[in-house]
Amino acid sequence: MMNHKRKLVWLIVFALLLSVTSIETGFAKPKKKKEALTGTPVLWERPNDIASRDLYLGPGGAAMRPDLRRITFIKEEKGGYSKKYRVKDGAGREWVVKIGKEAQSETSAVRLLYGLGYLTEVNYLVPRVTIPGKGTFSNVRFEARPDNLKRAGEWKWKQNPFVGTPELQGLKILMALINNWDLKDSNNVILKDGNELHYAISDLGATFGHASTTPLFWRFTRSRNSPANYAKSNFFEKVKGDRVVLHFGGKNRGLMKDISIQDAQWIGSLLSQLSDRQIRDAFRAANYTPGQINLLTGEVRERTNELLSLRPAVQIGRN
């Protein structure tokens, strides 16, 4: 009996020694180290051509439009609110197509951000397309997956190289202006382009709708891609000293607590350089109806004017 126990103990010791030795000698599979990101972070590039930017074709221009002569299904993309597929077009380029309610709103949102100098994804709205084996769909967003860009993870709203800068403050205000209530870090992406790290918002689908500022009703009242709801929603609430209180009912509401009048006027001055025709083109590119284009364009212009008209609140009496 004792001999049996001793043999068992020695077998256990031998097994442990073998496992330690295998780790030290490299037999065990080493953990893959996370590659450190190197490059110059870029969120926004100062544009000198806002008034002439093409908001119909957007950041990809005519050159990057998908070749629809032949579409090949690759796989289904998991995650998110909308159904998504990875496909290859007739030129052999890969795309992630988004089907459903978010396709139109995201297409327009990307174009407005691009028009002001923000780094964005490249996308196009295709009114009707057949994906072999999956079906025929209307209003499909094609988002490019170019070979020269490496998707290098997400970035955080509260921890990034641009905290406190006008461009990040302006981006926050833009999110409230287009009613993007889904401000999750997981909706952001870093795109490595050569020696630059492009900080972009990868999911702008939950825009041009409405979300209540009352926490209890937030999940029941929120909408996306609803021009009528967007036009009826509020944007600006009040000025407290030199701070701006925006009507924002989305996730990460704390992001909107440090907006100054100077921040608002900075982004407002950029928006004011867009013509009504350019703003209309951003919505026309997403295949909205003429009536919806008028409604959305008018609301964006009205909100721009609100930003430009803000002045510090006058305090009367003692503090």
Task: List each language-model region with its residue ranges.
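C-terminal catalytic region of ATP-dependent kinase domains
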Residues: 197-319
